[in-house]
Amino acid sequence: MDCLFCKIANGEIPSNKVYEDEKILAFRDIAPQADVHVLVIPKEHVASSANDVNAENCEIVGYIFAKIPEIAKLCGVDSYRIINNCGDKAGQTVKHIHFHVLSGDNLSERLV
């Protein structure tokens, strides 16, 4: 599969890892939109959140949300924004489900 995030998850492409376990990987965004901007991805390929999350793979979304507070703490923050861009018109550029975790003094009303 020619998926950027799959290649990052399996180590073909290096990343600045924040957290990793057997199910997920969290790494710093290469073009951060806030002081803290981390991407959290499942290691298993799930194409997007709108059309491809189903009964067989939906538990990974809950798992990611359960781990985000721990990931945020590792980044030194206790308040943050979680964003999921779903589809081309929403700005999704990598077709592998992922969540942006953002925090910082200059975040205010901005969106990714």
Feature annotation, model-predicted:
Residues 1-112:
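HIT superfamily nucleotide-processing domains
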